[in-house]
């Protein structure tokens, strides 16, 4: 009965466990069975706490049974139900205090407790802890503690329960220690899939729209990537072949329970790994290249000899589980993962990462020996152009760039780095993308004015109609040019979406309104004239939509841009020559003295006249978000695109999709002269060429280019931005010389003498 005489009379802990005199048949375990005696031999003293809840009533909803100090199993360090003397039980019966236990209990057999004993039967009920709430150097139950996890004095504080982070560590460590047999994980998978056969009429798991997790997005007939895991566990390996690291498609790699003393730096080549197990080896350090494995979700390093961890682990922003149990790690590292978990430790390593040595400067590649000194301002017929996506502050978030330290992402830090880089290159023409209005008007225009730059800027279309403060955050395109070298003749902006809907053939074309019009990407066009030579130049600064799922939109945006540029070029041909081309000069030097060797200013040449739009030199710079070989690339390079191109996906865009796309300019990528760079955008999830400097090859010639980034530096850096590169894009720079116009050959007139001789 719940309301009997002994309603609240519960026995002491001693009556739930065997007393010393009751175990004469186990004398070897007497030291484990000594109990702190209770004040009542019978254990039937009534509790004075009248608020104690009835054991027959469920605890309140806001109270966990494990937090009730009067329940039988109140140990805070064990999360498993019905644990007696550290062992899991198959029988779940409540011991009754009114009945004496028999002398022998076969199902409560006592087992010796060792600090590092491994349970091979019940991993889910592992009870030997090497850290946290229990010491790994003492017995589980000391004379000061009862076996149910509470102290002998009910007034003493109960130990703080072990948190979920360390519980997970211990459980995973126990599972790892069990997996010591050769090819344990491969055999486990084979056992699970035993008897399962795939028939030809089975449905493709991807056909229902569910994407396969951790599967390379390759063509289905790529048989090699049908297997993405390797298990070398329990082989006694002492070294790894370099050939292993050529399998860059690997998703899981098991190297556990071997005798590896070191891990090759080539491990950084396996960038697709999501699971890496190097537990139970003899490792004393982890190579810095481990930071290149940014797709890792689980990294297990149990039972090695690691005393520290490389700061490059901070790059692993997707890591959910880092197993470090069984290593003599420094307290600052171990305590953080014990108390706050893997994410906290990774963030700590990322933020505390020291600044590495900067890479060597990118080479300036001379393609034409006559232009060797022109980068510093030599021949007036030559000029340099730079394009740079600066990564707008609004887009540089910790969620998007989780591998970058907060200090390296801070806009104040990055904008100074950007400014110094632009000033260092000192290009005649600078095209910047992703510059917000606030940064352009409040920083770059003012700062670059000290370097003789004048600027033209337009924000993206969504800035129209916004409040002023909100509009400042909208990014756009800015084009700067040296004021002492060029005169601005005209400037224009192309809003691709608005231009598309104004076309006469846009009626009834739903894709124009549903896909293209909603994107507010733009291009800024400036028409310049060289003060000294009179040569004119069209500079297009474009930023094309980014999403790979909108290849059709990218193609149509570029087609509209080139169509508009063609119309503008035809208008620019008719602009009359400049009459006043003299640059502003101070009447006297700043020191008040005539500078020595000052030469007479060169008389500006008259403006060059052009008979057609295609004769005007043109540069098309920017971030096109399209790789070499794409439809966008081919349209610019070849001047024409067929109407049935697969990137259009049979969508309707008026005459552009019915009749095809074309432009009259003979454009060529500046870097195609030597082969495109390895990349212009560098992040863990995407590394490829998407930025270009296109030039009209009939009027311009490339004479020099800015080269690649230091390859050795990139072996330990998984992505930009960082402390040396302020954007996820690279700056591209090229030097050009204007080709002289070809005049028609003059035929000699010999008069009537010629006719006589014939």
Curated annotation (Swiss-Prot):
Residues 23-34, 101-116 have a biased composition (Basic residues). Keywords: Cytoplasm, Exonuclease, Hydrolase, Leucine-rich repeat, Magnesium, Metal-binding, Nuclease, Nucleus, Repeat, RNA-binding, Transcription, Transcription regulation. It is found in: Cytoplasm; Nucleus. PROSITE patterns: LRR. Its cofactor is Mg(2+). Mg(2+) binds at residue 434. The keyword rRNA-binding does not apply. It holds the Pfam family Exo_endo_phos. It comes from the Eukaryota. SUPFAM superfamilies: DNase I-like (SSF56219), L domain-like (SSF52058). It catalyses: Exonucleolytic cleavage of poly(A) to 5'-AMP. GO terms for cellular component: cytoplasm; nucleus. One of its GO terms (molecular function) is metal ion binding. InterPro entries: CCR4/nocturin_mRNA_transcr, Endo/exonu/phosph_ase_sf, Endo/exonuclease/phosphatase, Leu-rich_rpt, Leu-rich_rpt_typical-subtyp, LRR_dom_sf. Residues 22-123, 146-179, 196-217, 584-606 are annotated as: Disordered. It is an enzyme of class 3 (hydrolase). Belongs to the CCR4/nocturin family. Acts as a catalytic component of the CCR4-NOT core complex, which in the nucleus seems to be a general transcription factor, and in the cytoplasm the major mRNA deadenylase involved in mRNA turnover. Ccr4 has 3'-5' RNase activity with a strong preference for polyadenylated substrates and also low exonuclease activity towards single-stranded DNA. This is CCR4-Not complex 3'-5'-exoribonuclease subunit Ccr4. It comes from Coccidioides immitis (strain RS).
């Amino acid at each position: 009965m719940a309301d009997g005489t002994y309603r609240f009379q519960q026995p002491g802990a001693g009556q739930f466990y065997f007393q010393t005199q009751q175990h004469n048949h186990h004398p070897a375990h007497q030291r484990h069975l000594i109990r702190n005696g209770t004040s009542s031999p019978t254990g039937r003293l009534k509790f004075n706490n009248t608020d104690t809840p009835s054991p027959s009533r469920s605890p309140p909803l806001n109270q966990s049974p494990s937090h009730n100090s009067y329940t039988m199993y109140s140990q805070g360090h064990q999360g498993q139900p019905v644990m007696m003397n550290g062992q899991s039980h198959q029988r779940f019966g409540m011991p009754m205090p009114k009945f004496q236990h028999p002398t022998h209990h076969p199902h409560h057999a006592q087992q010796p407790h060792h600090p590092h004993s491994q349970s091979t039967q019940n991993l889910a009920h592992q009870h030997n802890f090497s850290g946290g709430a229990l010491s790994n150097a003492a017995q589980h139950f000391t004379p000061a503690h009862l076996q149910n996890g509470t102290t002998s004095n009910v007034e003493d504080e109960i130990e703080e329960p072990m948190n979920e982070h360390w519980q997970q560590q211990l459980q995973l460590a126990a599972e790892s220690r069990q997996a010591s047999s050769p090819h344990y994980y491969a055999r486990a998978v084979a056992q699970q899939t035993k008897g399962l056969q795939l028939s030809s009429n089975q449905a493709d798991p991807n056909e229902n729209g569910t994407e396969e997790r951790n599967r390379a997005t390759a063509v289905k007939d790529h048989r090699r990537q049908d297997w993405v895991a390797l298990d070398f566990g329990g082989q006694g390996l002492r070294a790894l072949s370099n050939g292993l690291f050529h399998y860059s498609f690997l998703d899981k790699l098991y190297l556990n329970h071997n005798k590896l003393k070191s891990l090759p730096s080539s491990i950084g080549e396996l960038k697709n790994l999501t699971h890496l197990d190097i537990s139970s080896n003899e490792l004393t350090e982890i190579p810095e290249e481990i930071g290149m494995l940014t797709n890792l979700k689980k990294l297990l390093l149990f039972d090695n000899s690691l005393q520290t961890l490389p700061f490059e682990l901070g790059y692993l922003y997707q890591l959910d589980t880092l197993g470090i149990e069984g290593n003599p790690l420094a307290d600052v590292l171990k305590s953080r993962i014990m108390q706050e978990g893997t994410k906290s430790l990774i963030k700590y390593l990322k933020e505390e990462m020291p600044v590495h040595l900067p890479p060597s400067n990118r080479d300036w590649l001379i393609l034409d020996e006559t232009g060797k000194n022109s980068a510093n301002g030599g021949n007036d017929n030559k000029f340099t152009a730079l394009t740079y996506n600066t990564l707008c502050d609004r887009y540089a978030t910790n969620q998007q760039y989780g591998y970058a330290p907060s200090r390296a992402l801070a806009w104040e830090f990055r904008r100074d780095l950007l400014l110094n880089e632009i000033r260092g290159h000192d290009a005649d023409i600078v095209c910047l993308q992703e510059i917000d209005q606030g940064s352009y008007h409040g920083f770059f225009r003012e700062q670059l004015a000290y370097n003789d730059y004048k600027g033209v800027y337009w924000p993206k279309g969504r800035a129209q109609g916004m409040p002023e403060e909100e509009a400042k955050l909208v990014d756009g395109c800015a084009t700067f040019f040296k004021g002492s070298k060029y005169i601005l003749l005209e400037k224009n902006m192309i809003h691709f979406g608005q231009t598309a809907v104004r076309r006469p053939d846009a009626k009834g074309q739903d894709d124009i309104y549903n896909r293209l019009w909603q994107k507010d990407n733009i291009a800024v066009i400036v028409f310049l004239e060289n003060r000294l030579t009179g040569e004119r130049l069209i500079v297009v600064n474009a930023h094309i939509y980014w999403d790979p799922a909108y290849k059709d939109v990218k193609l149509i945006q570029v087609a509209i841009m080139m169509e508009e540029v063609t119309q503008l070029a035809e208008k620019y041909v008719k602009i009359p020559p400049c009459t006043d081309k003299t640059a502003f000069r101070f009447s006297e030097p700043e020191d008040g003295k005539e500078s020595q060797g000052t030469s007479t200013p060169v008389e500006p040449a008259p403006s060059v006249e052009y008979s057609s739009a295609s004769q005007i030199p043109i540069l098309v710079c920017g971030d096109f978000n399209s790789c070499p070989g794409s439809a966008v690339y081919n349209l610019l390079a070849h001047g024409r695109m067929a109407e049935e191109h697969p990137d259009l996906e049979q969508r309707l865009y008026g005459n552009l999709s019915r009749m095809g796309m074309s432009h009259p300019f003979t454009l060529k990528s500046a870097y195609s002269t030597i082969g495109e760079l390895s990349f212009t955008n560098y992040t863990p999830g995407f590394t490829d060429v998407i930025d270009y400097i296109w030039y009209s090859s009939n009027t311009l010639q490339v004479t020099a280019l800015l080269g690649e980034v230091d390859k050795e530096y990139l072996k330990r850096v998984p992505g930009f931005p960082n402390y040396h590169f302020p954007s996820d894009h690279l700056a591209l720079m090229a030097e050009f010389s204007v080709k002289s116009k070809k005049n028609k050959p003059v035929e000699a007139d010999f008069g009537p003498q010629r006719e006589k001789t014939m």
